[in-house]
A protein has these predicted regions:
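Nucleotide-activated sugar donor-binding and catalytic core shared by glycosyltransferases
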Residues: 1-373
């Protein structure tokens, strides 16, 4: 049997890598092909199709790169039609994967999609297209069960979140400190401006300016920044030089270890906010994007919140600073509240534990039981 896996961004690559590892251990005769990334490559998925070709963010970033994205998509589809996999699993990236899934489904190939599109936040009418697009959906957030049933979509199962199973309920902080060789005695603050190059460009400057303000107020702070690529590294180093901050360390990768040892984190909204929840790290969420993208974002958004901690708890657990609200001053103010208020941090940790438990299932086993039944 042959399975093809399609991913479009780093978070999907992490999910794919975990699933590939499980398949190779428990279903060694399954052949795996598809799009690769840094994590899935380590699990043996070598491919000429790489997620680096799809790393754009925002409506207008997509428009500016549309020709190259469409070329990549069409080449990948032709590759799959030639390979004729028994199963196609699209992981997230719905605007990319839905096209692939629909074309393969028309050819009689069994199609699955992992990660329900955020239909509960915007474009709820997409649910009507699910049946024509793929055969089965794997939902990873528990609040989606009620929403999908309400809209009478039945071909799905809730499988929990892959990271909730990978990350212990009580992570080993000392182990992460040893891995990072960090012995700092003061407060540690994780800074996560995003993983895609466009995210880093939009979010780094305001973040570093906020650290200048925080460093003036608090002594002995250490800021840690996980860097995911050489392109991101060069841009972040440039901004670091411009702001002349001395108490920031850039670390290649290790975002999980950084979140684990951080007293608080300041995060550009995205999957990293959920990772912070699973590591029980209190956070401030901010999000910078172009004015045009922000206009469309506000027009389409139906959810009251944008960050996963708030969406999953259905309340304002963490501060959200969006677009023009995401100033260095506002970020520093919200971060200061977390630093100063121990009881608030403890309450957040309690709430995060509850979210973690609700999403901690045998995800890969549940997926494979459905794929290979």
């Amino acid at each position: 049997m042959k399975i093809a896996i399609g991913i479009g961004e780093l978070s999907g690559d992490i999910f794919a890598a975990n699933l590939i590892k499980y398949i190779r251990k428990n279903y060694p005769n399954i052949e795996i092909i598809g799009i690769t990334g840094p994590n899935s490559f380590k699990q043996g998925l070598a491919s000429k199709f790489n997620i680096s070709s799809l790393s754009v963010r925002g409506y207008f970033d997509v428009i500016f790169n549309l020709q190259s994205i469409l070329k990549f998509r069409n080449n990948f589809l032709n590759f799959l039609l030639n390979e004729k996999p028994d199963i196609y699993l699209g992981i997230d990236a719905p605007d990319f994967n839905f096209f692939i899934e629909r074309k393969l489904k028309e050819k009689g190939i069994k199609t699955y999609h992992m990660v329900c599109p955020s239909v509960w936040a915007w474009r709820a009418n997409r649910i009507r297209k699910f049946k024509k697009t793929f055969d089965y959906l794997f939902s990873i957030f528990d609040h989606e069960k009620k929403f999908l049933k309400l809209h009478k979509f039945k071909n799905f199962s809730y499988v929990g979140h892959p990271l909730a199973q990978d990350i212990p309920l009580l992570p080993n902080v000392n182990k992460s400190k040893k891995i990072l060789n960090i012995n700092h005695k003061g407060k540690i603050i994780g800074l996560l401006p995003g993983s895609r190059p466009s995210e880093v460009v939009w979010n780094t400057d305001v973040l570093f300016k906020a650290t200048v303000l925080l460093s003036k107020r608090y002594k002995n702070l250490l800021f840690l920044v996980p860097v995911t690529s050489k392109n991101n590294l060069s841009f972040i180093q440039k901004k670091l030089f411009e702001t002349k901050i001395k108490n920031i360390q850039l670390i290649h990768g290790h975002s999980h270890d950084i979140l684990n040892i951080s007293d608080i984190a300041i995060i550009a909204s995205g999957t990293a906010t959920l990772e912070a929840v699973f590591f029980k790290t209190p956070m401030v969420v901010y999000y910078k994007l172009s004015s045009l993208s922000h206009f469309l974002f506000k027009f389409l958004l139906k959810s009251k919140y944008i960050s996963l901690p708030n969406i999953l708890s259905n309340k304002a657990l963490v501060s959200e600073l969006i677009h023009k609200q995401a100033t260095p001053e506002n970020i520093a103010i919200e971060a200061s509240k977390l630093i100063d208020d121990v009881s608030h941090r403890q309450q957040l940790i309690k709430e995060f534990k509850d979210i973690h438990k609700r999403h901690r299932l045998n995800t890969n086993e549940l997926i494979c039981n459905q794929l290979f039944q």
